[in-house]
């Protein structure tokens, strides 16, 4: 695999990227295969069994709600990665690390367990590159490969945390407010459901509102569809980033008091827009634009919900 090649340092990041560009492989050649028609039932059974096992057995499980368990512990996949049996192996590898706190009263808080795990995860050797090419997620092998960009390391943390029954996932900016790239990082939820974040290899979990990067919009990857957005789309053709809304808009969690609705009057638009049209809020990236939010044109204005700094 690409991550394996880079991890073993047989090639540098530039050479790996060049090899992909010069060879015949292309992401566009990949075929979309639906899980429901191809997944091994034993994979689902094992995933469910191990997810419920850790939720019931770990002391912090009592403070993980059923909804958060279903969304941020139970899912058998993170995105479009190759499927595999991953929970048991990762559990057996990392669960002993938590023996030191398991009987302590504070172990009932999943945040405490997440802190202990991160302290161990970051000391293992890793190979980071911002040049990792676009494509499908690498899958659970990233836990062993420990190579890639911020997205791959965010995946690594999710696999480990979920295998131990700790609610965890990935928050992201489709485009950073101060850079020309997207960015991914991890979140967990404490016993009160409050969001704490970390950016590998930083071992510290901190409150989401402490994240200083200019953000504009922040989304949380989810397993379940955002039915509110599906209904808002009303069957219209959408940009691929929003066509299948497997996300929650969590900008307000990060922006605190710095966000409010952004209203744009039709009087200042440079193009005629009609009622019901889909309009995108974009950030620039070099010589292009990347949509980070969308809205439906109303009678005489556009209203984008909760961008930071508005």
Question: Where are the model-predicted features located?
Answer:
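Short, small-residue-biased leader/transition segments that mark boundaries at the very start
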Residues: 2-6
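Acidic low-complexity segments
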Residues: 38-112
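Hydrophobic/aromatic-rich core segments of domains that either
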Residues: 103-121, 130-140, 145-240
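Beta-strand-rich domain onsets/edges
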Residues: 234-261
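A short, amphipathic beta-strand motif
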Residues: 260-271
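Short amphipathic beta-strand segments in non-cytosolic proteins
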Residues: 278-295
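Short Pro-Gly-centered beta-turn/loop motif in secreted/extracellular proteins
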Residues: 301-310
